[in-house]
């Protein structure tokens, strides 16, 4: 599912659902489904697979990399938010791709992320990013700067 609305409407209509693939509504950029959709999945034991942790590219390429967001050109507000995240990443020695891949995995309902890769070097980058340290102070600063939902679970 690619939207929070589709996620919230579809899950209750499928009894016995084991898992759902969620392609956009829970990323480092967007936590709209945190309080309802993901909370419901957690309550009902439905595992979530995050299918677009890089938000269509901008969280892998960064604000200067020409990455898309939500399957199109990133709006200026998104680019500005990513720049804020990049500044926090730089202060804590965390790469933006590491933050993007690790963030959704902190939620107890999330079982996996599908990062996607076109080339072998992208697979290698994803593996490195998953193993990268993301200190508690990093996540705290993202919250303090209102770059992520203050209630989003992270390793603290």
Predicted regions and their residues:
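Beta/alpha (TIM)-barrel catalytic core signal, keyed to glycine-rich beta->alpha loops juxtaposed to Asp/Glu
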Residues: 1-155
């Amino acid at each position: 599912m690619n939207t929070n609305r589709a996620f919230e409407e579809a899950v209750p209509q499928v009894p016995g659902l084991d898992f759902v693939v969620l392609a956009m509504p829970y990323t480092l950029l967007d936590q709209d489904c945190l309080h309802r959709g993901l909370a419901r999945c957690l309550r009902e034991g439905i595992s979530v697979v995050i299918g677009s942790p890089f938000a269509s590219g901008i969280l892998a390429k960064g604000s200067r990399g020409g990455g898309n967001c939500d399957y199109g050109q990133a709006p200026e507000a998104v680019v500005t938010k990513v720049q804020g995240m990049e500044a926090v990443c730089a202060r804590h020695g965390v790469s933006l791709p590491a933050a993007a891949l690790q963030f959704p995995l902190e939620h107890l309902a999330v079982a996996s992320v599908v990062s996607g890769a076109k080339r072998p070097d992208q697979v290698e980058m994803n593996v490195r990013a998953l193993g990268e340290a993301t200190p508690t102070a990093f996540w705290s600063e993202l919250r303090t700067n209102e770059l992520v939902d203050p209630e989003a679970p992270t390793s603290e």
